[in-house]
């Protein structure tokens, strides 16, 4: 099987980690161009033997979420529309793929939140992320070959897993050990 990694950040470390494990089922690991999330999704040809792994940071393509991160008012209807657009592009890709794997979005260390009110208010970052993941799940519920992966198991919010220098140098938001989980 061919595994194609698609992201809006650098997944070269994940590729190297997968290749070093010599997984028998994976013949080839390919990383799409850095920062070319939508371009990669739209340009990939039909390959019903390929598994596509799409890992994104929501603030890079869900503009209403990015507004929420900087404490601007958001419109829920636009947020839902943006999530649906993202989901539709993944559903279209699934028609050209064996399987599509999509890690859920999670609250990352650099997100400013509203503390104990984060789940109470509509603008709470934790609440918005949860709502976005639920919306993705609803969009994908009837698509047999799209799988949401619970990324909270990866502990991405821990200081142990982040490295600012790595981000600035290579555009990888996580320590290499995240990719070996």
Segment roles from a protein language model:
Residues 1-181:
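Extracellular glycan-modifying ectodomains
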């Amino acid at each position: 099987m061919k595994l194609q990694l698609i992201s809006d950040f650098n997944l070269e470390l994940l590729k190297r980690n997968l290749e070093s494990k010599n997984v028998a089922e994976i013949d080839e690991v390919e990383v799409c161009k850095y920062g070319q999330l939508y371009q990669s999704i739209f340009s990939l040809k039909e390959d019903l033997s390929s598994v596509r792994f799409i890992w994104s940071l929501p603030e890079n393509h869900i503009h209403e979420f990015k507004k929420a991160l900087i404490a601007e008012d958001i419109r829920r209807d636009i947020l839902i529309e943006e999530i649906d657009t993202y989901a539709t592009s993944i559903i279209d890709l699934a028609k050209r793929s064996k399987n599509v794997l999509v890690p859920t979005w999670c609250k990352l260390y650099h997100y400013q939140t509203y503390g104990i009110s984060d789940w109470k208010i509509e603008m709470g970052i934790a609440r918005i992320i949860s709502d976005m993941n639920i919306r993705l799940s609803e969009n994908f519920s009837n698509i047999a070959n799209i799988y949401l992966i619970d990324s909270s198991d990866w502990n991405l919010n821990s200081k142990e897993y982040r490295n600012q220098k790595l981000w600035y140098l290579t555009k990888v938001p996580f320590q290499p050990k995240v990719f070996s989980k």
